Amino acid sequence: KTSTRTRCAFEVAARDQGAGVTYLEPSASQIGHKESIKDTARVLGRMFDGIEYRGFGQDVVEELAKYAGVPVFNGLTNEFHPTQMLADGLTMREHSDKPLNQIAFAYVGDARYNMANSLLVLAAKLGMDVRISAPKSLWPSENIIEMVQAVAKETGGRILLTENVQEAVKGVDFIHTDVWVSMGEPKEAWQERIDLLKDYRVTPELMAAAENPQVKFMHCLPAFHNRETKVGEWIYETFGLNGVEVTEEVFESEASIVFDQA
């Protein structure tokens, strides 16, 4: 997958530590096209000390890790976004005077993919209080839920899944969301997703429902919060929405810490 923040973060971090970086563009690489993942992993593992992979399938990054013989970092797959969790956990700690295991946060929106899954894992491992709010058809898979519940039993983490968004955000310190249509999905998905998620937009009213004047808004970006992009304008012209998963008022408010996070 293409990338702005993730690629830049890896490259800046590597160069700050004196490491060299080679970027293989999706269109220029033969991975999975003319050369198998297994073969590619064994070649790259002989040339590099580490590999960051950003793509669609979790199975691909796991196969790279199996055969490369060097550390492989998951820069994002459809299922997980672990490096973003380093940023999210740090950002929540920086913007709270509570220890991590006393922080409560909610994720609202489409909860089937990498951000909701990864936030569940983060909360379970660190003993945090996480609430996932989405229509039941957009909840994480049963396998993910069972996995994080088992981990949370060991750490004291608290996990709630609910369709009631007001219940989810009450008393939280942070409200997270993400885009409703992910990279690679067809335009036709927008209508269905908007119909399902219209009550899960992060608005000033939803922020107020936290009943916490210090509540912060988080989003891994990019966000559809106004009409200032081609996609944002198309959404406005097609569906009449100026901003999708979050309103401009919340995104640009003092409660928004998205640029610290991203």
Swiss-Prot record:
The record marks E94 as: Important for structural integrity. Gene3D superfamilies: Aspartate/ornithine carbamoyltransferase. Its main location: cytoplasm. Its EC number is 2.1.3.3. Carbamoyl phosphate binds at residues 3-7, 30, 54, 81-84, 219-222, 247. It comes from the Bacteria. One of its GO terms (biological process) is arginine biosynthetic process via ornithine. The keyword Transferase applies. Pathway: Amino-acid biosynthesis; L-arginine biosynthesis; L-arginine from L-ornithine and carbamoyl phosphate: step 1/3. Belongs to the aspartate/ornithine carbamoyltransferase superfamily. OTCase family. Reversibly catalyzes the transfer of the carbamoyl group from carbamoyl phosphate (CP) to the N(epsilon) atom of ornithine (ORN) to produce L-citrulline. This is Ornithine carbamoyltransferase. It comes from Neisseria flavescens.
